[in-house]
Amino acid sequence: RAGCVEVDPPGVRFSFVSHMAGLYFHIPFCSHKCGYCNLFSLQTNRADYIATYLETLHKQAQQLSPLTTGLAFDSFAIGGGTPLLLTVSQLEYLLETAALFGVHPSHAFTSIETSPEYADPARLTWLK
């Protein structure tokens, strides 16, 4: 697209036109592969895999965030896999990672993919 720049390290996607931007975090973990899904996903909830992935995503954000100085992120999406497979503390860490780009859900249209399997009271309260 004319005027659009995309940078796609694993797990992070952001694109921007002018000074508005959107940020996408891909969380590839799920309990099972849905028949309609054609996205990269890992059928696991192993804590060590998830922790390593989130730490790596955070390090990438630290490296890339200087490239986005001066941009206003008007959208933020978390997809997967099943992002709500993460614990509430891991979801909080994901928001801390987004904050490195200056993204906060109260200032950007925010969406997160989920499954009824993980829509428990603690996660639903966190989503509010």
Spans of model-derived segments:
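N-terminal leader/targeting signatures
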Residues: 10-12
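Short amphipathic alpha-helical/adjacent loop interface patches that line ligand
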Residues: 27, 54, 58-61
